[in-house]
A protein has these predicted regions:
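Non-heme Fe(II)-dependent double-stranded beta-helix
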Residues: 1-111
Length: 111
């Protein structure tokens, strides 16, 4: 298990987030990017609505990311072994689009 250090856990508890965590190799990141580009080509209109949610249900690549031991071990260090993936979302902001995303909480807490 690659757990977080006590300093990382303290940082999370003090700040409410932890960054960076090295969870993808360059090859894995390339695979994820290729998968996003494939999804954009196959279902371009779906990414504007509900189709951008729960992408791990249609993509083996994103399902693999959801089950990554690097991610799960880090989460386990904070909340324990009972982990539930509540969803996955492709939130894509293309470089040619204006605007920004301000600091926000993605969703309410589950449970």
């Amino acid at each position: 298990m690659t757990s977080l250090t006590s300093d990382q856990i303290n940082d999370y508890n003090n700040n409410g987030y932890l960054a960076p965590i090295n969870v993808l190799t360059k090859n894995e990141a390339s695979e994820v990017r290729s998968e996003i580009e494939k999804i954009e080509k196959l279902w371009p209109n779906e990414l504007d609505g509900l189709g951008r949610n729960y992408v791990h249900m249609i993509s083996p690549v994103f399902d693999k990311v959801c089950h990554s031991t690097k991610i799960l071990d880090a989460v386990e260090s904070i909340i324990g072994k009972k982990i539930l993936v509540g969803g996955t979302t492709l939130f894509i902001k293309n470089k040619d689009k204006k605007g920004f995303v301000s600091v926000h909480q993605d969703d309410k807490y589950i449970g």
